[in-house]
């Protein structure tokens, strides 16, 4: 049985979808699960035992042509994708992105069973024949609900009659399409995101950190600067206050991409000038190198951005700062975490990329003291567990 799992981008979204892919693979271990993904994100799926084959596709290139209405190029790209996917003879396609572009990917597969999210926009619903219903849950649970349509879809499909799907105890859930969880699975077991770091990558990260910091008894705090939305970011001066307030007892690693390397130049110059215990990795890591360094951190502090979800997937304790996005939908769901919001604001979760108030007070109003207190609390919890 060949399954195509569709979640093309981005970091957090792909990681949120890994629980659904694992759910499918654990219940259909003989199936071959392929995942189609934007090439720059493929690193996130490497060494994942629940993904048999990664199929890179230039989603960003297609979207760029779409915005300019380059219809001929779009058609050629889709036709090339169809020719690439057809030899796999997919039995099932699972779309947890719910966009027109992912609907077109489903169409290109020719799969008779096509699962997707309910209530989607951009005509995505035209391309799926089994749809989930509940869109009010955490996004991980939304994706799982799509995956959990599979037993029913298989039973109702002519695939079963053609004998192309095995119906052994391992493959179908005791022939009960309504059974979606195993009795031995906890909430965290089901909803945990997956990101796998190799032993070699982990050893390299630990060696790198040991070489940088002289005081190896101090905890290492990962701080993820910036976000894809300006409204989700915590101001630079707040990060500075946090670092200064804890520099006597902690080492810090700063994470971010090329954008953050530019945006936080002044902060990095300041911590270097003051000789604060900060390791600047802004714009200097691949996704996998970042993952290995995050895994070596004792606590990670972040706004709602990709590296936050990487840390959660790696089961690191996190302090998550939320403003315009809703943590009940996008925040930590498993592991050891604290979520901080500025509850003085009545517009939390507005999902606006530009604040109509002129400044994102939901984020700038988060006090570094609150963050420090939550970091210390998590460090104490981790310390007590070690003892």
What name fits each language-model region?
Residues 1-387:
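Catalytic machinery of carbohydrate-active enzymes
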């Amino acid at each position: 049985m060949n399954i195509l799992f569709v979640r093309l981008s981005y970091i957090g979204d792909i990681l949120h979808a890994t629980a659904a892919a694992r759910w499918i693979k654990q219940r259909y271990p003989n199936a071959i699960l392929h995942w189609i993904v934007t090439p720059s994100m493929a690193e996130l799926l490497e060494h994942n035992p629940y993904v048999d084959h990664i199929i890179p596709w230039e989603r960003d290139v297609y979207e760029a042509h779409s915005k300019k209405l380059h219809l001929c190029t779009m058609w050629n790209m889709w036709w090339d994708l169809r020719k690439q996917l057809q030899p796999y003879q997919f039995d099932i396609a699972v779309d947890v992105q719910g966009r027109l572009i992912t609907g077109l990917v489903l169409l290109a597969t020719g799969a008779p069973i096509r699962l997707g999210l309910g209530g989607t926009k951009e005509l995505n619903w035209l391309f799926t024949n089994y749809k989930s219903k509940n869109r009010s849950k955490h996004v991980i649970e939304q994706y799982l609900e799509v995956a959990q349509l599979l037993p029913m879809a298989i039973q109702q499909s002519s695939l079963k009659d053609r004998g192309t799907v095995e119906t052994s105890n391992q493959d179908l859930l005791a022939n009960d399409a309504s059974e979606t969880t195993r009795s031995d699975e906890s909430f965290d077991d089901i909803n945990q995101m997956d990101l796998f770091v190799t032993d070699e990558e982990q050893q390299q990260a630990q060696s790198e950190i040991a070489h940088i910091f002289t005081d190896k008894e101090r905890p290492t705090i990962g701080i993820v600067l910036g976000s894809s939305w300006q409204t989700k970011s915590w101001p630079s001066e707040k990060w500075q206050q946090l670092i200064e307030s804890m520099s006597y007892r902690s080492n810090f690693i700063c994470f971010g991409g090329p954008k953050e390397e530019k945006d936080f130049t002044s902060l990095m110059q300041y911590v270097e000038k003051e000789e604060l215990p900060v390791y600047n990795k802004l714009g200097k890591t691949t996704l996998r190198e970042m993952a290995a360094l995050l895994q070596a951190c004792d606590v990670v502090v972040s706004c709602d951005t990709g590296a936050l979800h990487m840390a959660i997937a790696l089961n690191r304790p996190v302090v998550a700062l939320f403003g315009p996005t809703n943590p009940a939908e996008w925040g930590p769901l498993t592991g050891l975490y604290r979520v901080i919001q500025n509850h003085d604001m009545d517009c939390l979760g507005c999902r606006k990329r530009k604040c109509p108030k002129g400044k994102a007070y939901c984020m700038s109003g988060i006090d570094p003291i609150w963050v420090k207190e939550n970091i210390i609390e998590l460090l104490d919890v981790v310390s007590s567990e070690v003892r």
